[in-house]
Amino acid sequence: ITGLVGSEMCIRDRCCTKGFRLRMCHQNSLRFFDEVAYDPVFNGLVLDDKEGDRLVEVMGGKSVLFHANHGIIVCGPSVAEAFDDMYYLERCCKVQILAMSSGEDLNIVPDDIAKKFKEDCASDGGKAHWAKLHFDALKRGLTRGPGRIFRE
Protein backbone atom coordinates (compact mmCIF):
# COMPACT_ATOMS: atom_id res chain seq x y z
CA ILE A 1 0.00 0.00 0.00
CA THR A 2 3.02 2.29 0.48
CA GLY A 3 3.34 4.50 -2.57
CA LEU A 4 -0.32 4.07 -3.47
CA VAL A 5 -1.74 5.98 -0.54
CA GLY A 6 -0.79 9.54 0.25
CA SER A 7 -2.80 9.69 3.47
CA GLU A 8 -4.43 7.37 5.98
CA MET A 9 -6.90 8.47 8.64
CA CYS A 10 -8.64 6.60 11.40
CA ILE A 11 -11.66 7.45 13.52
CA ARG A 12 -13.20 5.67 16.48
CA ASP A 13 -16.80 5.81 15.38
CA ARG A 14 -20.25 4.99 16.64
CA CYS A 15 -20.66 2.05 14.24
CA CYS A 16 -18.88 -0.56 16.35
CA THR A 17 -21.72 -3.05 16.61
CA LYS A 18 -20.90 -6.64 15.76
CA GLY A 19 -21.45 -7.26 12.08
CA PHE A 20 -22.07 -3.60 11.21
CA ARG A 21 -22.17 -3.01 7.45
CA LEU A 22 -22.47 0.30 5.66
CA ARG A 23 -25.72 0.02 3.74
CA MET A 24 -26.49 1.94 0.57
CA CYS A 25 -29.52 3.60 2.14
CA HIS A 26 -29.02 7.27 1.26
CA GLN A 27 -27.20 9.49 -1.19
CA ASN A 28 -23.99 10.07 0.80
CA SER A 29 -23.46 6.37 1.37
CA LEU A 30 -23.49 5.75 -2.39
CA ARG A 31 -20.08 7.40 -2.79
CA PHE A 32 -18.71 4.38 -0.86
CA PHE A 33 -20.35 1.74 -3.04
CA ASP A 34 -17.95 -1.22 -3.31
CA GLU A 35 -15.21 0.72 -1.43
CA VAL A 36 -15.57 -0.77 2.04
CA ALA A 37 -13.79 -3.82 3.44
CA TYR A 38 -14.63 -5.37 6.81
CA ASP A 39 -12.22 -6.96 9.29
CA PRO A 40 -13.89 -8.89 12.13
CA VAL A 41 -10.51 -9.59 13.79
CA PHE A 42 -8.92 -7.25 16.33
CA ASN A 43 -5.36 -8.13 17.33
CA GLY A 44 -4.62 -5.05 19.43
CA LEU A 45 -2.26 -2.28 18.38
CA VAL A 46 -0.63 -2.58 14.97
CA LEU A 47 3.00 -2.62 16.05
CA ASP A 48 4.60 -4.74 13.36
CA ASP A 49 4.60 -5.28 9.63
CA LYS A 50 2.82 -8.63 9.93
CA GLU A 51 -0.41 -7.09 11.24
CA GLY A 52 -0.10 -4.16 8.86
CA ASP A 53 0.30 -6.55 5.93
CA ARG A 54 -2.75 -8.50 7.12
CA LEU A 55 -4.85 -5.33 7.16
CA VAL A 56 -3.69 -4.40 3.65
CA GLU A 57 -4.70 -7.87 2.48
CA VAL A 58 -8.12 -7.54 4.14
CA MET A 59 -8.63 -4.18 2.42
CA GLY A 60 -8.04 -5.81 -0.96
CA GLY A 61 -7.52 -2.51 -2.77
CA LYS A 62 -10.53 -0.79 -1.20
CA SER A 63 -10.12 2.64 0.36
CA VAL A 64 -12.14 2.05 3.55
CA LEU A 65 -11.76 -0.56 6.27
CA PHE A 66 -14.22 -1.11 9.10
CA HIS A 67 -11.90 -2.72 11.65
CA ALA A 68 -13.65 -4.55 14.50
CA ASN A 69 -13.16 -3.07 17.97
CA HIS A 70 -10.95 -0.37 16.50
CA GLY A 71 -12.72 1.95 14.11
CA ILE A 72 -12.74 3.05 10.52
CA ILE A 73 -9.56 3.40 8.47
CA VAL A 74 -9.72 5.53 5.32
CA CYS A 75 -6.94 5.75 2.74
CA GLY A 76 -6.68 8.29 -0.04
CA PRO A 77 -4.23 9.76 -2.52
CA SER A 78 -4.13 13.04 -0.55
CA VAL A 79 -4.95 14.35 2.91
CA ALA A 80 -7.85 16.29 1.40
CA GLU A 81 -9.40 13.20 -0.20
CA ALA A 82 -8.91 10.99 2.87
CA PHE A 83 -10.42 13.71 5.07
CA ASP A 84 -13.36 14.26 2.71
CA ASP A 85 -14.12 10.53 2.69
CA MET A 86 -13.81 10.33 6.48
CA TYR A 87 -16.08 13.35 6.90
CA TYR A 88 -18.84 11.91 4.73
CA LEU A 89 -18.39 8.35 5.97
CA GLU A 90 -18.86 9.45 9.57
CA ARG A 91 -22.09 11.17 8.57
CA CYS A 92 -23.25 8.12 6.63
CA CYS A 93 -22.81 5.96 9.71
CA LYS A 94 -24.68 8.49 11.84
CA VAL A 95 -27.63 8.66 9.44
CA GLN A 96 -27.75 4.87 9.09
CA ILE A 97 -27.69 4.28 12.83
CA LEU A 98 -30.40 6.89 13.38
CA ALA A 99 -32.52 5.24 10.67
CA MET A 100 -31.91 1.79 12.17
CA SER A 101 -32.99 3.05 15.59
CA SER A 102 -36.47 3.69 14.18
CA GLY A 103 -37.03 -0.05 13.96
CA GLU A 104 -38.14 0.29 10.34
CA ASP A 105 -36.42 -1.41 7.41
CA LEU A 106 -33.78 0.59 5.57
CA ASN A 107 -34.68 1.57 2.00
CA ILE A 108 -31.66 0.20 0.12
CA VAL A 109 -30.66 1.76 -3.20
CA PRO A 110 -30.23 -0.89 -5.93
CA ASP A 111 -26.60 -1.69 -6.85
CA ASP A 112 -26.89 -0.41 -10.43
CA ILE A 113 -28.07 3.01 -9.25
CA ALA A 114 -25.45 3.14 -6.48
CA LYS A 115 -22.70 2.28 -8.97
CA LYS A 116 -23.86 4.95 -11.45
CA PHE A 117 -24.08 7.57 -8.70
CA LYS A 118 -20.52 6.80 -7.57
CA GLU A 119 -19.24 6.98 -11.15
CA ASP A 120 -21.02 10.29 -11.74
CA CYS A 121 -19.48 11.80 -8.60
CA ALA A 122 -15.98 10.77 -9.68
CA SER A 123 -16.27 11.89 -13.31
CA ASP A 124 -14.01 14.68 -14.59
CA GLY A 125 -11.86 14.55 -11.45
CA GLY A 126 -14.90 15.56 -9.44
CA LYS A 127 -14.08 13.72 -6.25
CA ALA A 128 -10.55 15.11 -5.97
CA HIS A 129 -11.71 18.61 -6.94
CA TRP A 130 -14.54 18.75 -4.40
CA ALA A 131 -12.38 17.17 -1.69
CA LYS A 132 -9.75 19.89 -2.15
CA LEU A 133 -12.37 22.65 -2.02
CA HIS A 134 -13.88 21.11 1.12
CA PHE A 135 -10.50 20.77 2.84
CA ASP A 136 -9.39 24.28 1.82
CA ALA A 137 -12.62 25.73 3.23
CA LEU A 138 -12.06 23.89 6.50
CA LYS A 139 -8.51 25.25 6.73
CA ARG A 140 -9.73 28.80 6.04
CA GLY A 141 -12.18 28.47 8.89
CA LEU A 142 -9.37 27.43 11.21
CA THR A 143 -6.94 30.17 10.14
CA ARG A 144 -9.15 33.26 10.13
CA GLY A 145 -10.48 35.44 12.87
CA PRO A 146 -10.03 35.42 16.64
CA GLY A 147 -9.15 32.12 18.20
CA ARG A 148 -7.64 30.69 15.03
CA ILE A 149 -6.00 27.38 15.80
CA PHE A 150 -4.31 26.40 12.56
CA ARG A 151 -1.45 27.94 10.64
CA GLU A 152 0.01 26.65 7.40
Q: What name fits each language-model region?
A:
Residues 1-6, 10-11:
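Single conserved hydrophobic/aromatic residue that forms the stacking wall/gate
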Residues 12-152:
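Glycine-rich flexible loops
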